[in-house]
Each structure stands twice: as C-alpha cells, then as structure tokens.
C-alpha cells in the first residue's frame, strides 16, 4: 500500500475507492467537526486531525503526524470562493476571500516533506485565478512551476467527470505534480453515461414514498411545488409554465433563474450535484420523470440518496452513519470530487 495524506478532506467522499487501488490515506485534516465525525466513521483506521489548518497548532499537529513514508499528498481546498454558484465571481472578490489562500497552507506542508506525488483539486475556475506571490499575481500552475520544477513534473488539466464513466457533468481543475523519473498519465476518456443508463431502472417514486431499496426514499415536498412539477416535462423549468407555476404560500409567483424548478433530462449526463441537491427549487434538481396516462409527469421530487450515490459514483450501499441527515449527506457529496474520478486519476501513477 502507498501511504497518503489528505488535506481539506471534508467527509472523505472522494477517497471512497482509494484503498481498492492500493492507496492508504493514513492522515487527514478537516475543519468541520461533523465532517470529521463522518470521516472517522468511514475510515476508522485513518488518523483525523480536526481543526483549521491556518491555526499554527493544528498545522504543527499535521506535520508531527507525517512520518516520512507517505508518498502522496492530496489537497482539495474549499472552493466556495471561486464556485460559479457562489457570489464571488471576479478576481477582486477572490482576493478578499480568505478561503482562497488555503492553497498556501498546503504548499507549506509540501515544502516541509518529500512527497513523490501531489494532487491539487478544485473547481474549474480555479485555473484562471491569480494569487499574490513574490510581488506578483500568478496562477497556481505558474507558482508551482516556479517553486518545484527542478524536482517535479507539473501538469494541469480541467477534467470533466462525465468523460470518465460517471453520469454527471462536473468539470474539475486538477494539478498533478510528481517526481522526475515517476510516471502519472492522465486517464483516457470514456463514453458518456446518461441519466437513463444510470438510474432508469429504479422504480418511480412520488414525494415521501419509500421503495424499500436502500435509501431510495423520496423527500417530502410541498403540494404547490408538486403540482407545478407534475406539469413540467424533462429538461424544462416550471418557471416557464403558463398555468402551473411555482408559488409561495400566499399565492405570489416565485421568481428564479432559468435552471431552477427544472427537471433533469434522461438522455444526458446529470448536471453537477451541488450541496443543495435536496432543494426542489434549486439548480437542475428534479427527477426527469415519466409521462403518465393523464399527461402529467411522475416523480415530482429531487433525486433520492440512492440515485445520488449512483450519480456521484459512490457505492450503492455506501455505509453512511445513522446520525447523518439527508441534507448533511447531500452537502458532503456536493462538496466532493466524484470518487470514481479520483480512483481513475490515481490508478495510472507508477513508481
């Protein structure tokens, strides 16, 4: 087994298959207590350092627990500061968001150790952002080239999960760094998997219904939203309906973006699953549905956790702890790179 260290690991969703390919994450760090608790449930043999890596005491704990035989560093700093779904969409706001400088804490861990392989993963827009470095503003690739080119091969890519056997469109920024003399090819692209291929075999469910299949239970939605979505076809937003329009309790029509209150499409990969995938009115969250005999559309609901596991490339019977709520599980999945994508990226590295 190759030993690894994981920073900003959240609940460890992205690490689900690493042990199967010979990578043992022996040390992890995460800020949020609930995510740490989830990680410990999923990976009881890994040591979790809980706390903010910017805190020197926490950082020193991480450094003290790195024994020197760890070959891989994985760093997936939080992306809220650069996500297109957040409020910060330009360089000025990026500069003022402290979350975007967590990469320098990862760099400090790299500088004080001797890893053979380093993976930095983030949202695709991370590639175009610039950081203050030696009196200049440089992108992360140029910073890494300046610091590490003598010892490492450094590559950057924007890879989309849909090209690697995952039924979800999810572009991610990947920076790979590996010692000269090692090899780490980029995995080959595969055919896309549609939503129909991924979850079309599962039984129809309406709001609140339980199929009896592991976590294939529909969330409860209010009757107003259900009515609007039963009159909305796949790929369409209920906000475009002329009559059956989403409304508040007081009857006022709800306003939103073109991709809110919107059904997914059967014959395309799923849109990227966000931390808010349990909200029927949020971005591209509603099941594609099936047209019924009366002309209405079934499955007026968000995807179930079972469906979400499949879309996220998690095991269908992923062992989530009993205390974890539906929304918390969705949040952890929405924060993470799909684990099958991580598996395929790491599977190509060689000594």
Question: Which role does the model predict for each range below?
Answer:
Residues 2-113, 123-135:
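Core alpha/beta nucleotide-donor-binding catalytic domains of modification enzymes
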Residues 7, 28, 99, 137, ...:
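Aromatic-acidic/polar surface patches that form glycan- and anion
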Residues 12, 33, 78-80, 124-125, ...:
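Short, solvent-exposed loop/turn segments at secondary-structure junctions
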Residues 223-351:
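C-terminal target-recognition/interaction regions appended to catalytic cores
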């Amino acid at each position: 087994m190759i030993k690894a260290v994981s920073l900003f690991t959240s609940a460890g969703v992205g690490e689900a298959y690493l042990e199967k390919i010979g990578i043992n994450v022996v040390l992890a760090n995460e800020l949020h207590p609930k995510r740490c608790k989830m990680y410990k449930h999923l990976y009881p043999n890994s040591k979790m350092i809980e706390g903010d890596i910017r805190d020197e005491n926490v950082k020193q704990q991480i450094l003290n627990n790195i024994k020197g035989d760890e070959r891989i560093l994985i760093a997936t700093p939080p992306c809220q500061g650069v996500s297109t779904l957040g409020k910060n969409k330009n360089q000025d706001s990026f500069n003022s968001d402290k979350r975007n400088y967590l990469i320098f804490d990862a760099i400090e861990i790299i500088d004080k150790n001797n890893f053979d392989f380093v993976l930095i993963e983030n949202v695709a827009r991370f590639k175009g952002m610039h950081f203050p470095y030696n009196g200049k503003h440089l992108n992360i690739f140029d910073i890494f080239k300046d610091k590490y080119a003598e010892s490492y091969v450094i590559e950057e890519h924007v890879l989309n999960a849909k090209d690697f056997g995952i039924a979800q469109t999810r572009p991610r920024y990947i920076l790979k760094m590996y010692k000269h003399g090692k090899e780490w090819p980029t995995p080959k692209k595969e055919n896309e998997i549609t939503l129909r291929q991924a979850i079309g075999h599962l039984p129809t469910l309406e709001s609140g219904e339980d199929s009896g299949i592991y976590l294939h239970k529909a969330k409860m939605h209010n009757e107003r939203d259900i009515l609007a979505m039963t009159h909305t076809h796949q790929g369409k937003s209920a906000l475009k309906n002329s009559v059956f329009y989403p409304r508040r309790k007081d009857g006022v029509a709800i306003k939103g973006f073109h991709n809110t209150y919107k059904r997914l499409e059967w014959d395309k990969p799923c849109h990227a699953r966000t931390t808010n995938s349990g909200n029927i009115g949020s971005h591209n969250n509603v099941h594609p549905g099936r047209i019924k005999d009366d002309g209405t559309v079934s499955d007026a609901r968000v995807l179930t956790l079972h469906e979400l596991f499949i879309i996220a490339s998690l095991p269908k019977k992923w062992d989530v702890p009993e205390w974890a709520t539906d929304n918390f599980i969705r949040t952890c999945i929405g924060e993470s790179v799909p684990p099958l994508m991580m598996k395929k990226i790491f599977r190509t590295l060689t000594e």
